Amino acid sequence: CGKTETAKQQAQSAVYLQDPDEGPSLVALAEVRPSVLLEGAEPHLIDEWQMAPQLWDAVRFAVDQGKGKGRFLLTGSATPKKRPKHSGVGRISRMHMRPMSLFESRESTGAVSLAGLFDGAAEVGAISDRSIEDIAFALCRGGWPEAVLESDPEIALDQAKDYVAELLDSDIDEMDDKKRNSTWLRAILRS
C-alpha cells in the first residue's frame, strides 16, 4: 500500500526494524531501553513497529510527556505477536491505507464510483476506453504501488502473486500464532 514510502515523505528521521543489518540489534535495544529508538528529528518514523511491540507503549508514554502532536509515525503491516499494554486511545491515531484505486492509478475516469454503487446512486453508467482485458489485468494486478508503476505486465502480476503467497504462507500465521492450511486458503481465494 506504500505505508512506509508515504510516512518517509513526512518524516525527518527514521528507524527501520526490518533492516537485516541493524534490525535484530534495534529489536533487542527496544527490549531494554525503547526510548532510545524514539530519538531523532520529529516527526520520527518507526517502521514495522510490531516487531518490538513495547515501542507502542514507549510512544504512548512519550506523548503523555507533551511536546505536541504528530511526533511519531508508526508503520507496520502485521499484527504484533505481543499486544501493547495500552490501546493508545487519545494519543495514537490509526490510518488505514488501501491499495491504489483504478482512479488513483489513472486507469479510470472515476465516472462510476464503487462507493456510489453501494450508496444507491440513482444513475450509474459510463463508457470506458479500457478493454475488458485491461480491466481484468488491473483487477488481477491489484493496486500495490510497485505493481501499478511496473511497466512489464508479467512482473506486475508476479508481484501480486508473490504478495498473496507471502500472506498465505507466513503473515497470516503471525497474526495469532495459529497454523492455517495455506492450500485450503488458496482454494477459497480461487473460488
Task: State the predicted function of each range.
Residues 6-7:
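Hydrophobic positions on the alpha1 helix immediately C-terminal to the Walker A/P-loop
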Residues 12, 41, 68-70, 89-93:
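Short glycine-/polar-rich loops that comprise or flank the Walker A/P-loop
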Residues 2-3:
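Conserved glycine(s) of the Walker
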Residues 107-191:
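Interdomain hinge/linker elements that couple catalytic modules in large macromolecular machines
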Residues 80-95, 106-111:
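Short regulatory helix/loop adjacent to the ATP-binding pocket of P-loop NTPases
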Residues 11-22:
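Post-Walker A helix-loop "phosphate-sensing" segment adjacent to the P-loop in P-loop NTPases
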Residues 25-73:
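Conserved nucleotide-sensing/catalytic segment adjacent to the nucleotide-binding pocket
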Residues 48-51, 55, 78, 88, ...:
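Helical "lid/switch" subdomain of P-loop NTPase nucleotide-binding domains
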